[in-house]
Swiss-Prot record:
GO terms under biological process: translation
Organism: Levilactobacillus brevis (strain ATCC 367 / BCRC 12310 / CIP 105137 / JCM 1170 / LMG 11437 / NCIMB 947 / NCTC 947) (Lactobacillus brevis)
Keywords attached to this entry: Ribonucleoprotein, Ribosomal protein, RNA-binding, rRNA-binding, tRNA-binding
Protein name, per record: Small ribosomal subunit protein uS13
Spans annotated as Disordered: 89-121
UniProt xrefs under InterPro entries: Rbsml_uS13_C (IPR027437), Ribosomal_uS13 (IPR001892), Ribosomal_uS13-like_H2TH (IPR010979), Ribosomal_uS13_bac-type (IPR019980), Ribosomal_uS13_CS (IPR018269)
Role this protein plays: Located at the top of the head of the 30S subunit, it contacts several helices of the 16S rRNA. In the 70S ribosome it contacts the 23S rRNA (bridge B1a) and protein L5 of the 50S subunit (bridge B1b), connecting the 2 subunits; these bridges are implicated in subunit movement. Contacts the tRNAs in the A and P-sites.
Superkingdom in the source lineage: Bacteria
Similarity comment: Belongs to the universal ribosomal protein uS13 family.
UniProt keyword Ribonucleoprotein, yes or no: yes
Any Gene Ontology CC annotation: small ribosomal subunit
Cross-referenced SUPFAM superfamilies: S13-like H2TH domain
Taxonomic lineage of the native organism: Bacteria, Bacillati, Bacillota, Bacilli, Lactobacillales
Subunit details: Part of the 30S ribosomal subunit. Forms a loose heterodimer with protein S19. Forms two bridges to the 50S subunit in the 70S ribosome.
GO molecular function: rRNA binding; structural constituent of ribosome; tRNA binding
Length: 121
């Protein structure tokens, strides 16, 4: 089970789909990495030669993935909160950030509904 960017890739999947287990690499980026590394698309992770593995690892190192990407995203959110932007306030209050309506839904962000005592007559 090869380790690339600190992630164990699944042995039985093709290399492009195995790379998507790395945070920050989607299927399109994975196909680009495989093509740039010169590895055939139909090779399974278990069948990679050490040379091919090194080429793929070198291509993945060009991208910001896993811990570095998670850190950047959290720092971006923290920066939005510190400058007092609207998006930062929404993050701080745990509400939807991208303009969704919240009158009826948004339960994922707002959490479980709390009933108000004495509301019904």
């Amino acid at each position: 089970m090869p380790r690339i960017a600190g992630v164990d890739l699944p042995r039985d999947k093709r290399i492009a789909y195995g790379l998507t287990y790395i945070f920050g690499i989607g299927i399109n980026t994975a196909h680009k990495i495989v093509a740039d590394a010169g590895v055939p698309e139909d090779v399974r992770v278990r069948d990679l030669t050490p040379d091919q593995e090194d080429k793929v690892r070198a291509e993945v190192d060009k991208y910001k993935v896993e811990g570095d990407l998670r850190r950047e995203v959290s720092l971006n959110i923290k920066n939005l909160q510190e400058i007092g932007s609207y998006r930062g306030m929404r993050h701080r209050r745990g509400l939807p950030v991208r303009g969704q309506h919240t009158k009826n839904n948004a339960r994922t962000r707002k959490g479980k509904a709390v009933s108000i005592a004495g509301k019904k007559k």
